[in-house]
Amino acid sequence: MNKILLQCDNLCKRYQEGSVQTDVLHNVSFSVGEGEMMAIVGSSGSGKSTLLHLLGGLDTPTSGDVIFNGQPMSKLSSAAKAELRNQKLGFIYQFHHLLPDFTALENVAMPLLIGKKKPAEINSRALEMLKAVGLEHRANHRPSELSGGERQRVAIARALVNNPRLVLADEPTGNLDARNADSIFQLLGELNRLQGTAFLVVTHDLQLAKRMSRQLEMRDGRLTAELSLMGAE
């Protein structure tokens, strides 16, 4: 078994608005190994996106903790969490969230700029990642000049440009047609094999989830089962 990279212990998330209390996550516990490809499957409203926000340090659990590489996130300052997200985690969303006035190359380079890398390193690494996703020839195009599949590939290159140990992906193919969705998942698998990056993908699509090496099911804020989807039709 691979060394545990990320572990969540009894995560709970509760929102309070006036006298109304909403429990979104209930005692969620699981781990992700180094280099693992894992899917969490569930319908809209099951708590998947809230869980990813907690795992990425974008929100704080009501109780429980997230442990990344042996270090509890609850003990990290806001600045330390920001550094962790920049250096060790990558994020891919259903919508690409590319900056519209910047080229593909500039969008991919953004995490390196934030991390204050050297200019020569920034340019070469961003180009390297665009090449890895098959878009080096589109480096100087803005998002409006790219197709939906190309924009999502740029977003993936951006997520991986700092060579993160784990990428958190929230419905990464949700806005794509079947052909582009298939292409994106093939790309994630290839990057996992080449770079050893771990991926945790949340999705409602069983056909896409079955491509991951491990699948968990989430319902009403609870992990209910470990699925066996390999080869499922």
From Swiss-Prot:
ATP binds at G42, S43, S44, G45, S46, G47, K48, S49. Its EC number is 7.6.2.-. InterPro entries: AAA+_ATPase, ABC_transporter-like_ATP-bd, ABC_transporter-like_CS, ABC_transpr_LolD-like, LolD_lipo_ATP-bd, MacB-like_ATP-bd, P-loop_NTPase. Residues 6-233 form the ABC transporter domain. Transmembrane segments: none annotated. Keywords: ATP-binding, Cell inner membrane, Cell membrane, Membrane, Nucleotide-binding, Translocase, Transport. One of its GO terms (molecular function) is ATP binding. Part of the ABC transporter complex LolCDE involved in the translocation of mature outer membrane-directed lipoproteins, from the inner membrane to the periplasmic chaperone, LolA. Responsible for the formation of the LolA-lipoprotein complex in an ATP-dependent manner. Belongs to the ABC transporter superfamily. Lipoprotein translocase (TC 3.A.1.125) family. GO terms for biological process: lipoprotein localization to outer membrane; protein localization to outer membrane. This is Lipoprotein-releasing system ATP-binding protein LolD. It is a peripheral membrane protein. It comes from the Bacteria. The complex is composed of two ATP-binding proteins (LolD) and two transmembrane proteins (LolC and LolE). It comes from Shigella sonnei (strain Ss046). It is found in: Cell inner membrane. PROSITE patterns: ABC_TRANSPORTER_1, ABC_TRANSPORTER_2, LOLD.
